Amino acid sequence: MIQFKNFTAAFGKRKVIQGLTCNLPENSITALIGASGSGKTTLLRVLCRMNDRIENFRIEGSVLIGGTDIYRPDSNVYLLRRRVGMIFQKPCVFPKSIFDNVIFGVREVAKISKKDYPDLVEKVLREVFLWEEVKDRLGEKATTLSQGQQQRLTLARTLAVEPEVLLMDEPTSSLDPKSTAAIEKLVQSLKNSHTILWVTHQHDQAKSIADRVLVLEEGRVRPLSPATPFVRQEKSASFTNVLQDAQGCPE
């Protein structure tokens, strides 16, 4: 479980996340939607402490993953990033072979013998429905794959180090419909063993894949009930009107 307790994130005097108190349950998918610049990506970066070295970045309150406050002074950021995997908008593959891309992180963090690498590679590539497509091409450069395949490869590399939490920052925004459907199916298959936070601009997608949908507006999170119809506000970035009757996470 991920827990925010009166959490605020700010850059100098500008508060991006304000007084957030909310729980994201384990073994489920929570989708986060909101206007551009509302702080969605900042919230993801907070969970793996990617903003630590940004000048004037500061926090108040606490964030707990599995009951551990990740911003305690004695918190081990290296161990945190083993527990939290993040997938970005555009696939991030290295100019190495498909095989080497999968085991990239394993070499550093997993206690596994090199002789077991092939079995691990097959296992995670099967998990992301990519094995049958690449099993005869493992020595080829990962950059020869399509974008959809590269995104699944990125996810396979993340799964290889066995994270508890998966953070998905609009992972299908640059993909075609077929690849998007493949990623959505894949993430659904992973939710029983991971806490997943999926950021998207696509409201229909959020409601179709997530167990819970939250809206981030002006630094505050509001719930979007599955029974609440979403009416897109073409002339305003505000989501307030469609959330008047929603209940769930307090502001």
Segments the model singles out, each with a brief description of its role:
Residues S62-L79, G139:
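ABC ATPase NBD Q-loop/coupling interface
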Residues T68-D69, K115-D136:
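Conserved ABC ATPase "signature" region
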Residues H194-V199:
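Conserved H-loop
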